[in-house]
Amino acid sequence: AVEEAHLPGRVEHRLVAIGLDGSRQLLASGADFYHSPQVSDDGTQLAWIEWDRPDLSWTRTRLMRATLAADGSVAQVQSVGGADDAWQQPRFDRAGQLCCLSDRSGYWVPWQVAADGPRKLLAIAADHAPAPWQQGSNTWLPLEDGWMALSWSEAGYGHLALRHSVSAEERRLAHAYSRFRHLCSDGKALYCIGASPSCTAAILRIELATGELTRLLGEDSALDAADLSRPERLLYLSAGGESAHGFFYPPRNHAQQLDQPPPLLIFTHGGPTSACYPVLDNRIQFWTQRGFAV
């Protein structure tokens, strides 16, 4: 666990192990921040992310690895990532090999951290995670036999697939959904929270062997399909010739016919903290139902 200690005149972050009896054991200290501790399946390795001020979690971090003894103590602590790279979501595969997302190639994509240095795994040139603002992100998973479960974003839309790290064979999943979070697997199925233009959030189960999708929890919008405004990707030039991105929602109400251009509401955000996603937002539907474009 990541522990935050409020001490006289300062706040200190540390990595600790907490026993079932409530006992606490210090694992790592000295860095300004700690993130995403991960234990290998056999319990013999520990990985985590750490960094110091003035760096941020998406500008420059250290990927750390250590061995775990039977009593929970750590040894052979070493930094295994590049000195000027940013890392997030460390994971151990079934063979105990450390893998992690890094943006050293320009996008957040998975890398395998071998003894001779990091090696990029085959993945689409797109961000497979947002900026790591919070603990607990889980947007990718190493699976059996070189397969990975990956979610990524292209042109604002989220995608989900199984992809082989060597052959690049790919199986797209859950086509109707446009945002995916909190991936996990029991070895037979992939579970996640998915959202779509007609569904705010749903717990999904996807069979790894067949891709069959079952929605375990969550419902579509109660709006009639003719009244549901769906996002349309928008790209326009901003100050300095830069491209700006957005989503346009036209007014939708089968009981109303507009004979003139609708009033337009514009919502801006400072992303990526409060980025906009192409998923059902009832606040937007409130306005499009009443003749507004958003």
What are these regions (language model features)?
Residues 41-42, 93-95, 142-145, 185-187:
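Residue-level detector of Asp-centered blade-edge/turn motifs that repeat once per structural unit
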Residues 78, 119-133, 219-231:
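Surface-exposed loop and turn segments in beta-propeller and other repeat-based domains
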